[in-house]
A protein has these predicted regions:
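The feature encodes the CheY-like receiver
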Residues: 15, 57, 66, 75, ...
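Charged docking surfaces used in two-component/phosphorelay signaling
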Residues: 16-24
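Short hydrophobic/Thr-rich beta-strand motif most characteristic of the beta2 strand and flanking loop
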Residues: 26-33, 41
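Active-site beta3 strand of CheY-like receiver
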Residues: 45-51, 56
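C-terminal output helix
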Residues: 107-117
Length: 122
């Protein structure tokens, strides 16, 4: 059974590129374009991993990460923060909220795929 990944980004082109890259590698992808839908999909779908933008309509990525990581039912789900927020303070905030990895845009798809595989133990 393929691993399920929730991709959350409000940029449709970027979200589609990430989705195609991961599906090509055999992952099942579900998507959300805003913070509230992301939290809802994470709770209902229980993905194996989440790729999460920081700047989102509704709830931002840091709030979503914090809510999931401090909930016993979801804290085991690895979260990759994928964002244009590239300053050191942003990366530290990502770590503080519980993100497992912080990757800045623009990024190389092969690097993202390698990190996904690493976090999923593949």
């Amino acid at each position: 059974m393929s691993k399920k990944i929730l991709i959350v980004d409000d940029e449709p082109d970027l979200l589609e590129m990430v989705q195609i890259s991961l599906e090509t590698e055999g992952y099942e992808c579900i998507v959300a374009y805003d913070g509230f839908r992301a939290l809802d999909r994470a709770r209902k779908e229980k993905p194996d991993l989440i790729i999460l933008d920081v700047m989102l309509p509704g709830l931002n990525g840091h709030k979503i990460c914090r809510l999931l990581k401090f909930d016993e039912q979801y804290k085991h789900i690895p979260i990759i923060m994928l964002t244009a927020e590239a300053q050191e303070k942003d990366r530290l905030l990502g770590e503080e909220t519980g993100a497992d990895y912080y990757m800045t845009k623009p990024f190389a798809a092969d690097k993202l795929i390698a990190k996904v595989a690493e976090l999923l133990g593949k």
